[in-house]
Amino acid sequence: MDIARLKQLAGIGENPHFIQMPNPRKEFALRHHERMKLSMNESKPEKLELKKLAYETKDLAPVLSKENVEYHYNILSNGYVTRYNNKEGDPDFNYGGAMLHNLFWEQLQKADGSKPEGAIKELIEDKFGDLNSFVDEMIKTAMTIQGSGWVYLSKSGELKTTPNQSYKTDILMPIDMWEHSFTDYIPAKDAKGKYIKAMMTIVDWNQINMRMGK
């Protein structure tokens, strides 16, 4: 959406009556215009990049199959970046998809039995008691998603959801809850719960600690 259209929606575009507006109305329209600018994130970069995986696509099995990772990363994740860079479709949707997937893939590793340590361990214990309770609460939160979206641990230690590909600046650890993410667990009765529990075994907790330090 260009600035001219933005001004029109805000009521301050090519409006012959704007000049005659009483000052309070002018100020309100200008403030509304500024809020809309902020909500549109005009500071978005011109181009985005899909971060390279720090592991092979087979390394996340059996939590995520090689076929799942290759489709999810090479086709879907790459698609958000490509469409954003080519200015195709909804820029906010594609920007969010690219940002969320970069965080998602970056925080995974080959299962090695590691547990949360350092700052993330302290945060989990402070907010949830222990890792198992944290996972249980994440599953409960994920089950509130209507349609497609993500469940995530926020930087403040809260469990939240975000719809579709809506990127939030408070995201610390996102888990993709679109159906294509947990196809390896369908048709299990509790596919989402099994998927989230399994995902916790391939989280690179050091990566989460690095994010907390930023």
Task: Label the predicted regions.
Residues 42-214:
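Feature for soluble, non-membrane regions of globular proteins
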Residues 1-44:
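Intrinsically disordered, compositionally biased, charge-dense segments
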